[in-house]
Amino acid sequence: MTPNIHHDKILILDFGAQYTQLIARRIREIGVYCEVWPWDHSPEEILSFGAKGIILSGGPESTTSPGAPAAPQHVFDSDLPIFGICYGMQTMAVHLGGATEAADKREFGHASVQVIYPDTLFSGLSDHPSEFRLDVWMSHGDHVSRVPPCFTITAATDRIPIAAMSREDKRWYGVQFHPEVTHTLQGQALLRRFVVDICGCQTLWTSANIIEDQIARVRERVGCDEVILGLSGGVDSSVVAALLHKAIGSQLTCVFVDTGMLRWGEGDQVMAMFAEHMGVNVVRINAASRYFDALQGVYDPEAKRKIIGNLFIQIFEEEASKRKQAKWLAQGTIYPDVIESAGSKTGKAHVIKSHHNVGGLPEQMTLGMVEPLRELFKDEVRRLGVALGLPHAMVYRHPFPGPGLGVRILGEVKPEYAELLAKADSIFIDELHQADLYDKVSQAFAVFLPVKSVGVVGDARAYEWVIALRAVETVDFMTAHWAPLPYDFLSTVSNRIINELRGVSRVVYDISGKPPATIEWE
């Protein structure tokens, strides 16, 4: 019998911190299901969610500012264990009768915390046992200056007298540091202590259980109907294909839409892997001309994303109309897409880019939705793929945007631009593999710049296109550093692109971090 993997769960109320999704990923790694909701979500839904504990995340606001997000009263009325992290601890303190103040100096980076009182959260945890100290990561400007009534100060640093607090009878805890980041050495142990020991959650959230659960859910949802899936060869759609093929077999039809904006040779690779190797029913549709016609004269990135998303659905509905049993459209939507598209009722959350799987779906879509990865983070999707038997090279492929090269060609998208870019990108990726650098960077790709640059080809003056190379290192894709690739490697890539591709005279390397830049150029 499949265990109820959602029975024991944690709710994270998001106050806008860059690390909030990381908290959720760490809890999932422990083996417990959790969700991230905006801090101002409706009280009725929060209380009916059935969480065994609530975490208040960090956030960029100051509790001393008028209108700052505040911990909701109904959370404290719930009798559930509560864990406030950074801003979450501060808003907990203020709401319950304590106080906060701005620190003389902001504290960012490594810090050493002295445990004063080893409550249930801290008991037995230490990086320096003889001193009962923890090495942690701080990122705050304000701090708690007075704990609420009945609370105990449990930890301090040389700079702040209240680095942690608790009220054991209520099972309320707060820490000023960030246990979710790897720099806090006992961070995962602290989260486990709260989730498993204090909240009493069982660790049922495993790849094997998720696969069993999703197979049962898919079978119950679709019955004998046919399901169609857009198969691109990316990680998400590949894992969905493998999972659905295992769940419903011949009821699954994968539709590979060649948009003309995919990676070089991707169509043949997709057909070889799924149709020939796995025995999945795959229909290949050449829709490149339709996409390029629809994108003609369109320069705005958001407009391009919407057009690509809407045309994607239109093509699928056309294919479904040929299949009388096709009632469902499967998609590779993953949990970060859902979180970032939800937003906050207060308007404090801002949409940076719409998501191909979430933001571009037309309201009149006639197919039902099947999204078996909707609850999963990317690292969970990869582990699921391995458990399903997919090749490592496919599962650990770098991310590729839903709109494809359409958002890596700046401005208007043309067929000749897409062909040049796909070839340049293929050269870059090939050289990364040859130099054993591919797995050392988190994401790498080429970008087509719609500007021409003067060059010399042979003895003649040339006026040709510019290709930008982008490679980043990141843990969570919320922040990223540009990858310091060796100069001789970049020289090799540049020479190959310029020599092998007619129409390119210059190659540049993007050395922008995130923030301020995003990883993708559009």
UniProtKB/Swiss-Prot annotation:
Its EC number is 6.3.5.2. Keywords: ATP-binding, Glutamine amidotransferase, GMP biosynthesis, Ligase, Nucleotide-binding, Purine biosynthesis. GO terms for molecular function: ATP binding; GMP synthase activity. Pathway: Purine metabolism; GMP biosynthesis; GMP from XMP (L-Gln route): step 1/1. ATP binds at residues 232-238. It catalyses: XMP + L-glutamine + ATP + H2O = GMP + L-glutamate + AMP + diphosphate + 2 H(+). Residues 9-204 form the Glutamine amidotransferase type-1 domain. It is an enzyme of class 6 (ligase). GO terms for cellular component: cytosol. Residues 205-397 form the GMPS ATP-PPase domain. The active site is at 86 (nucleophile), 178, 180. CDD domains: GATase1_GMP_Synthase, GMP_synthase_C. HAMAP family: GMP_synthase. Homodimer. This is GMP synthase [glutamine-hydrolyzing]. The gene is guaA.
